[in-house]
């Protein structure tokens, strides 16, 4: 099921920055936010508790990638934090992903990273030594993720149709690299607009700078939300 709220990436370095940003929104506006490595490593689990305490939903984007036992234990901790969604690297393998699912339990959604949106096909060939197309690599990871019993994947919106065709329409596709029409590309090479992502079948979209660095973050969020919901 498509999430009607665009996820806001809280890419801030401090707790105070997060508090200041979220304070701009009225209490009745319940957001879905992404907490990534920078913020989580700077502040720790308390940032998740704080955001959840405000009534917002949390996608904890830590991209775990380790041996199955370690990932399982870490997921048990994240489950106790009350996260709504978290992720692992699909490259960790099916057994690692199964262990992650077991550790997290059945409540939160668990998705896997396929290829980062900053990765070009040339980089994948030269550095990862994967000699298929980028799209084929992503679909392969998605099929293995489904095999492991996870809910979906993080992927570029460009791969959504192929992924759902290879798995199922219920398989979740969360797409970063979303930018409102006319905005700067930044460091992500494969981008789409919210309207494009909706049309192509994305279930979740993630935006950071177009909202967090906007002159009026609330207006920017509402405009993107309206575009996402058509």
UniProtKB/Swiss-Prot annotation:
EC id = 4.1.1.23
Gene for this protein?
pyrF
Q: What is this protein called?
A: Orotidine 5'-phosphate decarboxylase
| GO annotations of cellular component type | cytosol
UniProt xrefs under PROSITE patterns: OMPDECASE
Its recorded reaction(s) are: orotidine 5'-phosphate + H(+) = UMP + CO2
Q: What does this protein do?
A: Catalyzes the decarboxylation of orotidine 5'-monophosphate (OMP) to uridine 5'-monophosphate (UMP).
Q: How does it assemble?
A: Homodimer.
Family matches, as InterPro entries? Aldolase_TIM, OMPdecase, OMPdecase_AS, OMPdecase_bac, OMPdeCOase_dom, RibuloseP-bd_barrel
């Amino acid at each position: 099921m498509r999430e009607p709220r665009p996820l806001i990436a809280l890419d801030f370095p401090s707790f105070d920055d997060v508090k200041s940003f979220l304070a701009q929104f009225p209490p009745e506006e319940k957001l879905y936010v992404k907490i990534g490595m920078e913020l989580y490593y700077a502040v720790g689990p308390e940032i998740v508790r704080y955001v959840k305490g405000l009534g917002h939903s949390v996608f904890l984007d830590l991209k775990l990638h380790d041996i199955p036992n370690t990932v399982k234990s870490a997921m048990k901790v994240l489950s106790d934090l009350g996260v709504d969604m978290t992720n692992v690297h699909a490259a960790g393998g099916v057994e690692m992903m199964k262990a992650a699912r077991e550790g997290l339990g059945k409540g939160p959604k668990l998705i896997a990273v396929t290829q980062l949106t900053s990765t070009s096909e040339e980089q994948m060939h030269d550095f990862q030594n994967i000699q298929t197309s980028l799209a084929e690599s992503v679909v392969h990871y998605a099929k293995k993720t489904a095999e492991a019993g996870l809910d979906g994947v993080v992927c570029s919106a460009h791969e959504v149709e192929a992924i759902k065709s290879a798995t199922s329409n219920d398989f979740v596709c969360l797409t970063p690299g979303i930018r409102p029409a006319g905005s700067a590309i930044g460091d992500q090479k494969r981008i789409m607009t919210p309207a494009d992502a909706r049309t192509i079948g994305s279930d979740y979209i993630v935006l950071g700078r177009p909202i967090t660095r906007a002159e009026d973050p609330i207006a920017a969020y509402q405009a993107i939300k309206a575009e996402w919901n058509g």
